[in-house]
Curated annotation (Swiss-Prot):
Chain ranges passing through the membrane: none
Lineage, opening ranks: Bacteria, Bacillati, Actinomycetota, Actinomycetes, Mycobacteriales
KW DNA-binding (keyword) present: no
Origin species: Mycobacterium avium subsp. hominissuis (strain TH135)
Location(s), subcellular: Cell membrane
Keyword Transport: no
Name recorded for this polypeptide: Putative lipoprotein MAH_0816
One Pfam family recorded for the sequence: Myco_19_kDa
SS bond list: none
Lipid-conjugated positions (N-palmitoyl cysteine): 25
Amino acid sequence: MRWPMQNRTTAVIAVALATTALVACSSRSASAVSSTATVTVDGKDSTMHIVKCTQLEWYRMINIGSDFAGAKIVIDQRAHPVTAESVRIQNLNGFTGMYSRGGDGNADLRLSGDKFTITGTAHGYKADKPGDAATATFKIVTAC
């Protein structure tokens, strides 16, 4: 009667190892919450206390602030050097706009350990003149 118990134990261990392997190989990863980020738009700083970092294969998504006011960044970590694919600024210091690689604007990304610094220009509009095109400079500093 010892053999059936050993078979059950072996089966449980095998299932646990298989589950661990599947989770480790999954393309989805857990989100990490960073403490703060500083987003500067046209020289005016905003300190944001909600920063969510998500890794999906070679892409890192950084969500700063909220849907109402904040920034969303997509970083391509496959590229050498690592590059910002897009930066979306939403209602910060009266500006809403974006940079997208291959489109208008520019972005320079510097990585030091887990600290990202992204600087550049984005195209969009200002809250006081939403019908007029506007360009703004930005600098985003955060850790993920």
